[in-house]
A protein has these predicted regions:
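Catalytic core of DAGKc-family lipid kinases
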Residues: 1-107
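Short beta-strand-to-turn element immediately C-terminal to the catalytic PLP-Schiff-base lysine
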Residues: 44, 64, 111, 139-140, ...
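Glycine-rich phosphate/pyrophosphate-binding beta-alpha loops
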Residues: 54, 58, 110-125, 190
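Short acidic/glycine-rich loop or secondary-structure boundary segments that cap or lie
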Residues: 58-61, 103-105, 117-120, 144-148
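Gly/Ser/Thr-rich active-site loops/lids in small-molecule metabolic enzymes
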Residues: 69-76, 125-146
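ATP/nucleoside-binding phosphotransfer catalytic cores, i.e., glycine-rich phosphate-binding loops
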Residues: 97-103, 128, 138-218
Length: 218
């Protein structure tokens, strides 16, 4: 089965990451009828995700954004971020990365198959959806103002220069919330709760006309 994707949603992060958001509507339809390209997915043992799974502050932002009726488009996530910021508190997590255990305090944990989340933000700009690996972005024990400044840089990927941002890469990622919010979101939708085990599923889906090279920083 081949997936033909024509961007038309609020965030369009999957389409953006796979090069399917460029051009006119006619161009996008033509791309959705092009030759298939194998693309990795994230697998939990029960469900698949395409772009990323998020815990912590961005999960709360996503819930807020989905409840909003105005505005449409990526600016909804910006307003949701500002609304959730006063209640932001980093939490403790245990991550297992290909068997290696790391305990840390974090405001943000993102496990990504592709580069974009939150309506075009380059949270993991080097994520490659064909390498059989997941990119993990952790924003550590930061204050509200520092987090806001970091999020302002996510559009370009410049947040990776922040000293409290850490990047990991693994084929299998386990997440346990020690004293953090347990909610988990994936592809902008509810995705259960922590703990969870996420595994890269190589070539799990065929996407028509996909361009899979990581975008890198803007």
């Amino acid at each position: 089965t081949v997936l033909g994707l024509v961007a038309g949603g609020t965030g369009n992060d999957a389409a953006e990451a796979l090069g399917l958001r460029v051009g006119s509507l006619e161009d996008r339809v033509d791309r959705a009828l092009a030759d298939p390209v194998p693309v990795d997915l994230i697998w939990t043992g029960e469900r698949h995700a395409v772009t990323s799974c998020v815990a912590g502050f961005p999960a709360a932002v996503n819930v807020r954004a989905e409840a909003m009726r105005f505005p449409r488009g990526p600016s909804r996530y910006t307003l949701a971020t500002l609304a959730e910021l006063p209640g932001m508190r980093p939490g403790r997590y245990r991550l297992t990365l290909d068997g290696e255990v790391v305990e840390l305090t974090a405001a943000v944990v993102v496990v990504a198959n592709t580069a974009f989340f939150g309506g075009g933000m380059r949270i993991c700009p080097d994520a490659d959806p064909t390498d059989g690996l997941l990119d993990v972005c952790v924003v550590g024990e930061v204050g509200r103002l520092s987090l806001l400044r970091s999020f302002a840089k996510v559009r370009t990927g410049a947040h990776l220069d922040h000293p409290d941002v850490s990047m990991f890469r693994a084929a299998a990622v386990g997440i346990v919330a020690l004293d953090a919010r347990p909610g988990l979101r994936a592809d902008g939708e509810p995705f259960g709760s922590l703990p969870c085990d996420l595994v890269a599923s190589p070539g799990a889906i065929q996407v028509a006309g996909a361009l899979t090279a990581p975008p890198g920083r803007a």
